[in-house]
């Protein structure tokens, strides 16, 4: 049996037409633990955390969680959040080694997305297409490594508090953004770090900048997935802007799951897209 497994940083909890599993991350506070399993009300969580004064953090899946997701399959393709900022990829890889030791006939490929959110959805959907084409294991792995070079992630955030609190960006950047009431535009870098590209005032300016960044990163008219945390109006507006600028653009809007909502926070947008060479 062939199976695709992703961690919940993808905000993807089901994938039609293929055997599929999502491995949840957790959002942890002093008072409760949120399991990002697809049933979590992510906007409600983000709203509660906005005024929460205690410590918060995230917890990645452990080896056992990944092993459970692999169980019963003999050809497994796992996609994880960037290994630069999370231990999920390492746990998935260690689980793959253990699973293959116990099941010598099985083959497991772990792909570090070097990203999060909607870029993982692009990767998972491309992977599904390859499997359904009947490609062999080695061919699928090679093509996924190639395709990963041509998918990208941009983000627009109203708040950087949780990113700074968990060491994902510098606290000084978050403090300046808060004081000046600005939105931050950033991207996932080629090594899986979160880089700030620019700061803008107002949502319209942020959306315009995203369109410019799409063009600057080689987007022409491929797939775009816009994920939002409690901000459907901005996501829909951006979708129409992209379609107006790029003829034939394949754009759709989704919602951030728990992990992405924790880091994007209320109002945040995450934009996964393919460049022209995808």
Predicted feature descriptions by range:
Residues 32-101:
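Class I S-adenosyl-L-methionine
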């Amino acid at each position: 049996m062939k199976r695709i497994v992703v961690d919940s940083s993808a905000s993807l909890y089901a994938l039609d037409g293929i055997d599929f599993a999502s491995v949840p991350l957790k959002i942890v506070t002093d008072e409760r633990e949120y399991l990002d399993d697809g049933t979590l009300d992510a906007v409600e969580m983000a709203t509660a955390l906005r005024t929460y004064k205690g410590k918060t953090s995230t917890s990645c899946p452990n080896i056992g969680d990944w092993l459970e997701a692999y169980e019963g399959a003999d050809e497994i393709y796992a996609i994880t959040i960037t290994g630069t900022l999370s231990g999920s990829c390492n746990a998935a890889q260690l689980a793959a080694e253990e699973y293959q030791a116990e099941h010598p006939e099985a083959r497991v490929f772990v792909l570090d997305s070097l990203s999060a959110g909607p870029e993982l959805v692009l990767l998972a959907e491309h992977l599904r297409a390859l499997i359904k084409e009947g490609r062999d294991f080695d061919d699928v792995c090679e093509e996924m490594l190639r395709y990963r070079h041509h998918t990208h992630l941009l983000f627009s955030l109203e708040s950087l508090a949780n990113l700074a609190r968990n060491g994902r960006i510098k606290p000084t950047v978050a403090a300046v953004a808060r004081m000046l009431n600005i939105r931050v535009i950033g991207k996932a870098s080629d090594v899986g770090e979160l880089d700030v590209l620019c700061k803008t005032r107002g949502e319209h300016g942020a959306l315009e900048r995203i369109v410019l960044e799409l063009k600057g990163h080689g987007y022409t008219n491929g797939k775009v997935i816009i994920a939002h945390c409690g901000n459907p109006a901005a996501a829909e507006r951006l979708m129409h802007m992209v379609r107006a600028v790029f003829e034939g653009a394949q754009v759709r809007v989704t919602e951030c799951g728990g992990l992405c909502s924790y880091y994007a926070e209320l109002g945040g947008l995450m934009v996964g897209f393919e460049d022209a060479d995808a």
